[in-house]
């Protein structure tokens, strides 16, 4: 295989959506920092929802973006929690995978703290090929990514099965 066609992990995004600002948001940030070792950023509401008492640009969640070795290490921990099984519908047509973890105490070494409570999280795995993505980002001569470079769903499944020993439940 061409070295530039090799699939790699671009990033792993871990998100906890709280739905409200305040004390629960700071506790969720503390949980993410304990799990990943990185300081989380706040996510803001895109629009106001009167029924849920949410205003536009109100912080309603926290997320951490992990890259390179940090992403691989966290992904191994998260897949261990899921017993290395991901459902087939978790993959999109661009080769990215998404799954949820219902409780942070499922991770190795994490214990329930009554002061924090229970928080679940969403994990997004973004894959890319080693080369070819610059043509979409550059200023001069910007073009769309050709279909030969785009990652298909079955390639992403094969990558995770081979590198992380994940079984995809169909």
Curated annotation (Swiss-Prot):
Gene Ontology biological-process entries: translation
Any GO CC annotation of this UniProt entry: ribonucleoprotein complex
Record keywords, A-Z: Ribonucleoprotein, Ribosomal protein, RNA-binding, rRNA-binding, tRNA-binding
Keyword set includes rRNA-binding: yes
GO molecular function, one term: structural constituent of ribosome
Pfam families assigned: Ribosomal_L5, Ribosomal_L5_C
Cross-referenced InterPro entries: Ribosomal_uL5, Ribosomal_uL5_arc, Ribosomal_uL5_C, Ribosomal_uL5_dom_sf, Ribosomal_uL5_N
Family to which this protein belongs: Belongs to the universal ribosomal protein uL5 family.
Biological role: This is one of the proteins that bind and probably mediate the attachment of the 5S RNA into the large ribosomal subunit, where it forms part of the central protuberance. In the 70S ribosome it contacts protein S13 of the 30S subunit (bridge B1b), connecting the 2 subunits; this bridge is implicated in subunit movement. May contact the P site tRNA; the 5S rRNA and some of its associated proteins might help stabilize positioning of ribosome-bound tRNAs.
Subunit field text: Part of the 50S ribosomal subunit; contacts the 5S rRNA and probably tRNA. Forms a bridge to the 30S subunit in the 70S ribosome.
HAMAP family per record: Ribosomal_uL5_A
Annotated protein name in UniProt: Large ribosomal subunit protein uL5
